[in-house]
């Protein structure tokens, strides 16, 4: 049976990437889609692992070819998700996570209506600013811009199926895992897998 496509969104600093990476490590049935981006790699990031890093000309060529399930501009950089790569994983029975913003999520819902979506919130504005500052990667004016972008991103929370608040990492990870586990036990997914057992029980 094909896997389920999940969209996970959050403002920068909410802990989305750490949560998603932890889920992928602990659940073999979950894969993370590797997006294309025009932004430069951050320290420790690897091409093909964290992102496919491409220049703007290559990115626009992929857009023109219709290769992206979704694409968006965030903080002046472009991000996109390969349609064929996602479909290949789903066909293998893997649940696939797209770690994208609300703009990309809206595009994916239109093109793949069966996807499920999760929005992750920080516990407070103060905590979000602390996390962004703690990274040590950005100047104060950049932090201010990211905070403004975060408020804009969070205003779209109601477009999602599930809402989590990342105030305790382990608890939030368990809640995220519970969403995936519960979906796998929906009737329409379990009935084909349990066909023989059901025949035996009801025969």
Curated annotation (Swiss-Prot):
User: Which domain of life does this protein belong to?
Assistant: Bacteria
> By its UniProt entry, which Gene3D superfamilies does this protein fall under?
Guanylate Kinase phosphate binding domain, P-loop containing nucleotide triphosphate hydrolases
Catalytic activity as recorded in UniProt: GMP + ATP = GDP + ADP
Q: Which GO cellular component terms are attached?
A: cytosol
Compartments annotated for it: namely: Cytoplasm
Pfam (any one) = Guanylate_kin
Residue numbers binding ATP: 10-17
Task: Give the UniProt keywords, A-Z.
Answer: ATP-binding, Cytoplasm, Kinase, Nucleotide-binding, Transferase
- The record's disulfide annotation reads none
What does the function comment of this entry state?
Essential for recycling GMP and indirectly, cGMP.
What is the similarity comment for this entry? Belongs to the guanylate kinase family.
Name of the protein: Guanylate kinase
The protein's gene is named gmk
């Amino acid at each position: 049976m094909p896997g389920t496509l999940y969209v996970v969104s959050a403002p920068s600093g909410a802990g989305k990437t750490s949560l998603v990476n932890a889920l992928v490590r602990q659940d073999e049935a979950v894969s993370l889609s590797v997006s294309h981006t025009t932004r430069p790699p951050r320290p420790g990031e690897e091409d093909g692992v964290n992102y496919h890093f491409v220049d703007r000309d290559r990115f626009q060529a992929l857009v023109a070819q219709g290769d992206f399930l979704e694409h968006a501009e965030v903080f002046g950089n472009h991000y996109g998700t390969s349609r064929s790569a996602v479909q290949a994983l789903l066909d293998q029975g893997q649940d696939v996570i797209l770690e994208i913003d609300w703009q990309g999520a809206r595009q994916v819902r239109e093109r793949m209506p069966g996807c499920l979506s999760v929005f992750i919130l920080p516990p407070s504005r103060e905590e979000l600013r602390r996390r962004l500052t703690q990274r040590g990667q950005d100047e104060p004016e950049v932090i201010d811009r990211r905070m403004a972008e975060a408020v804009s991103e969070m205003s779209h929370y109601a477009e999602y199926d599930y809402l989590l608040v990342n105030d305790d990492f382990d608890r939030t990870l368990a809640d995220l895992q519970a969403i995936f586990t519960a979906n796998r036990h929906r009737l329409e997914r379990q009935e084909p897998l349990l066909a023989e057992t059901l025949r035996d029980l009801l025969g």
